[in-house]
Structure formats: C-alpha cells, structure tokens
A protein has these predicted regions:
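Carbohydrate-interacting/catalytic domains
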Residues: 22-26, 30, 35-45, 49-238
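Aromatic-lined glycan-binding groove of carbohydrate-active enzymes
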Residues: 1-16, 39
C-alpha cells in the first residue's frame, strides 16, 4: 500500500525516494508497481503516484498536471493504466490471493543476483512474475520450474512504449528445456533488463519422462565438482 502517508511531511514522493538518474528512477518506479500488482493482496495507491509526481502532496494545491507534457511521465501514466488492466483481466492475480496453493516462489535465494520470481495460479491459469532489482542486465538467466511449458510475454516494464530501454525486435515467446535443479526438472531461460520486470503467461505441456533423470545427473555432476574442489583445497592447505 502506497498511501498519502508515503508522500507527505518531508518523506518525498515515491519517485523522488528512488536512487539514480531520471531514467533509472522511472525504471525502478515501474518495477516497484509491478511488484505491488503482481504480489498477493489488495492494492492501494495515492493520487499523483500514477504519473510519477515529484512534489509532495499538498491539500491546498491540485496535482502538477503539466508533468504529463514530459515523455517519461506521460509514458508512466500509460504504463500504470495498462498494469491496472492486466491485473483486472488476469484471474490468477486476484483469485485465491490468500490461498497459499495459489502462490509459489521460483527464485528468491540469491541476493547478489537480485532476481525474484514467483508463480501466481488461479482458475487453471499460471503466470510467472519476474523482477530484476539490479542496475545491470542478466543474459540467459535460468529459472527452474516443476513442469514443461511455453511462455508468452504479457507485460515488460522496459518496453519502449512505457519509456523503457529495450530496443528493436526481441523474443516474446519462450519454451522450457529439460533439466533443472532442486526437484524442478525444467529450465526457462530469459534475458532480464536492468531494473526491469516481466510477466509471462505459461502454457503447461505433458511432462518429459527423461527430465527427472537429466536433473538428477546434473545434480550428481555438481556434487562431484564440489567434492573435487573441496578435496583440492584440503590438499593444498597441507
């Protein structure tokens, strides 16, 4: 919830709290609201936040509507409206939002990579929400799933229409490959822009019976590598 309490009494507005250049602030702002809308729970937003208002709220003045003359603010307002439409038209984002079976973490363990991903599930639908909170891109980042699937991009916060940094043609349809870790036998590989987020609609497919074997072999190979490196380190210390 980002209410009026967050934008008064010297606390600065939401966009003005954020680090970086003008463009970096806008990128973070898009990802912040992506997180709010894609995470379970009801949404609360205070007027002005939806266009990246820089001046704190003043009950004696109207909003600075002139901001919409500037491309970043105009694009962000359009992004916010689109984000709201996505939320209202994708049942998995609101159906069963307090049911733990409708939410599943996919990536949340590596603070150094700064990538967080989770599944939202509802009414037979599966959506994969992905955030890159770092100021650099990740190329071919692996996400491990329990089922094989195709993936279609629904929303990308770095799309040019929202003022994002992505340029040219890009791949918006993805597919899992066999092999994974931690009992998740399938891998979805994706390019993640700096401080960007994306929403993918998943289409599950029939499981490959060889996928579990491939994952087990990869896990065993990793254990052997760790064992060899540990043994080498032990010998070198003698």
């Amino acid at each position: 919830a980002l209410s009026h309490d967050e934008v008064v009494h010297g606390k600065k507005t939401i966009i003005d709290k954020l680090w970086g250049t003008y463009a970096e602030k806008c990128a973070q702002l898009r990802t912040l609201y992506f997180y709010m809308y894609m995470h379970p729970g009801k949404k609360l937003n205070f007027m002005g936040n939806e266009m990246g208002h820089f001046r704190e709220w003043d009950e004696k003045r109207e909003l600075d509507w002139d901001l919409l003359k500037y491309p970043f603010h105009d694009a962000f307002q359009k992004y916010f409206a689109h984000l709201s439409r996505v939320y209202s038209t994708e049942p998995a984002l609101y159906d069963g939002e307090y049911n733990p079976d409708c939410f599943e973490w996919v990536a949340c363990e590596s603070r150094s990579e700064g990538v967080y991903a989770w599944l939202r599930k509802g009414q037979g639908q599966s959506l994969l929400c992905i955030m890159n909170t770092q100021d650099h891109a990740h190329k071919k980042f692996p996400l491990y799933l329990r089922f094989p699937c195709g993936a279609e991009e629904v929303l990308n916060t770095e799309s040019p229409e929202w003022g994002g940094a992505l340029k040219g043609r890009r791949k918006t349809s993805l597919h899992t490959t066999d092999g994974g870790v931690y009992g998740r036998d399938y891998t979805l590989t994706i390019d993640l822009p700096a401080m960007g987020s994306c929403l993918l609609r998943l289409t599950p497919e029939a499981p490959n019976p060889d996928a579990a074997r491939i994952s087990a072999n990869k896990a065993m190979a990793q254990k052997r590598r760790i064992a060899r490196s540990t043994k080498t380190a032990s010998n070198s210390s003698k």
